[in-house]
């Protein structure tokens, strides 16, 4: 998720992702797949009760070409998991997926995992952009074996040693990146490759692409 951020970004995004289109993929959107980010007082991420928050002074957000991006993903063979559950077989491994639309925007409607199969899957994977506690709780209750998420940027601006100050959701900043465990379920939260285009800086939180190997 959060793939676009700018109205003109789609061609560049597809060029960057092109090598990955050779592999099977699933996707879910984040808020910056729908709406362009806005310039805000950065202290709002630390103190949500700022005067600007209370007054609701934000301008109307700019809509991004979300449908066009998703159509391009579909044409390259990836599968959207936008409040959707489905089963895929990848290299002989049967995977049940459950994905939700962006929890940060409260667009999430959990579909559970596929139930219309006689044989169980080899693994059940939950996918969400923002790792809100309600989302992780639901995946755990539905029987996920592992959950993948992003959104937090790993804190983006961290203390020495990588300790995040904020998570931009209700997850404790101390566990807002990397492989954590929630209600007995492994959750991998990528700190991502980018940053807000209005705050193009990372401090003690380098860009990251994650390769996770699942084993029996």
What are these regions (language model features)?
Residues 10-18, 112, 165, 171-172:
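Charged helix-capping and loop-helix junction motifs
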Residues 24-26, 79, 96, 123-125, ...:
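Proline-centered loop/turn at the N-terminus of a beta-strand
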Residues 131-211:
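Conserved beta-sheet core of the metallophosphoesterase superfamily
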Residues 4-8, 32-39, 61, 81-90, ...:
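Active-site environment of divalent metal-dependent phosphoester hydrolases
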């Amino acid at each position: 998720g959060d793939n676009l951020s700018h109205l003109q970004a789609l061609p560049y995004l597809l060029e960057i992702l092109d090598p990955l289109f050779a592999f099977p993929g699933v996707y879910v959107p984040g808020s910056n797949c729908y709406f362009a980010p806005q310039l805000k007082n950065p202290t709002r991420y630390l103190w949500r009760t700022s005067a600007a928050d209370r007054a609701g002074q934000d301008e109307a957000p700019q809509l991004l070409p979300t449908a066009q991006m998703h159509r391009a993903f579909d044409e390259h063979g990836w599968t959207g998991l936008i409040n959707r559950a489905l089963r895929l077989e990848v290299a002989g491994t049967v995977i049940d997926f459950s994905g939700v639309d962006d929890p940060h925007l409260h667009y999430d409607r959990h579909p559970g995992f596929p139930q219309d199969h006689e044989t169980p899957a080899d693994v059940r994977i939950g996918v969400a952009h923002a790792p809100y506690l309600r989302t992780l709780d639901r995946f755990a209750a539905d029987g996920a074996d592992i959950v993948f998420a992003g959104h937090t940027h790993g804190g983006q601006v961290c203390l020495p040693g990588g300790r995040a100050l904020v998570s931009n959701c209700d997850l404790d900043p101390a566990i807002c990146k990397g492989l954590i465990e929630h209600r007995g379920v492994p959750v991998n939260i990528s700190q991502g490759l980018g940053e807000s285009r209005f705050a193009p800086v990372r401090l003690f939180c380098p860009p990251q692409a994650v390769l996770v190997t699942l084993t029996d």
